[in-house]
């Protein structure tokens, strides 16, 4: 009988302990985590509304061009593009036309080649110089050496547009995506996404379509 009573007491004590332990652990966890900042998941690239990442890259004229060095401008049209991609080539004349029209209004084009020439030799710096001369580029054509700028922006394609607005000497993202809705033919374009966003900014209006899907070639990154 004495043994039986001891067994019952042991079972009751174990039951109480098992019920109270999670609660005590939860209380302890709350004490540990209370007041501690949560660590968000690592963000990849920029979103609309973010402050743009500054950069300084070599232009095809061998001069360094920095975003923060631009003067008397209202913003900038940063376009990640390249030599070899058929999508990028299809848009070259349209990019030239956009630069001609909007540079005078305060929004110059800045083209950046994000590709690793070891993976795509046609996108080497020397071939960038040749292409810029052949096409008569009126805008800087910069080389993202070391591939540090394109991931900071979150570019994934060529071409990939990031429209920046300048406020108090800082740049903020107002549009991300495609130039328009038809890479094959400029004559068949129905929606000029980039120009619509530019016109809205110039009229001090909100950009209604702030993001679209960039259509183009994947950026060629180093496999080493």
Where does each model-flagged region fall?
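Structural microenvironment flanking redox-active thiols in thiol-disulfide oxidoreductases
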Residues: 89-134, 145-152
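Short, internal strand/loop/helix patches
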Residues: 129-170
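Short, low-complexity, disordered segments immediately C-terminal to signal peptides
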Residues: 20-36
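Short active-site neighborhood of thiol/selenol oxidoreductases, capturing the structured segment around
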Residues: 68-89, 198
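C-terminal motif of bacterial Sec signal peptides marking the signal peptidase cleavage site
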Residues: 15-18
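Thiol-/selenol-based redox modules, centered on thioredoxin-like
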Residues: 163-224
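N-terminal "domain-start" segment that seeds a small globular fold
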Residues: 32-68
């Amino acid at each position: 009988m004495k043994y039986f009573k001891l067994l019952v007491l042991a079972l009751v004590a174990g039951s109480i302990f098992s019920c109270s332990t999670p609660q005590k652990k939860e209380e302890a966890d709350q004490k540990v985590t209370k007041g501690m900042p949560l660590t968000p998941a690592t963000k990849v690239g920029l979103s609309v509304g973010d402050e743009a990442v500054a950069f300084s890259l070599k232009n095809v004229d061998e001069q360094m061009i920095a975003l923060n060095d631009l003067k008397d401008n209202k913003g900038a049209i940063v376009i990640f593009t390249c030599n070899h991609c058929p999508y990028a080539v299809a848009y070259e004349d349209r990019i030239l036309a956009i630069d001609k029209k909007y540079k005078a209004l305060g929004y110059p084009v800045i083209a950046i080649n994000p590709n690793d020439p070891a993976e795509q030799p046609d996108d080497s710096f020397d071939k960038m110089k040749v292409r810029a001369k052949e096409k008569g580029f009126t805008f800087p054509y910069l080389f993202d050496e070391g591939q540090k700028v394109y991931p900071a922006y979150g570019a994934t394609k060529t071409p990939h547009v990031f429209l920046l607005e300048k406020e108090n000497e800082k740049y903020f993202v107002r549009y991300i995506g495609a130039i328009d809705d038809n890479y094959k033919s400029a004559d068949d374009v129905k929606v000029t996404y980039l120009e619509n966003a530019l016109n809205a900014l110039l009229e001090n209006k909100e950009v209604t379509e702030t993001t679209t899907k960039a259509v183009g070639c994947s950026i060629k990154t180093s496999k080493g």
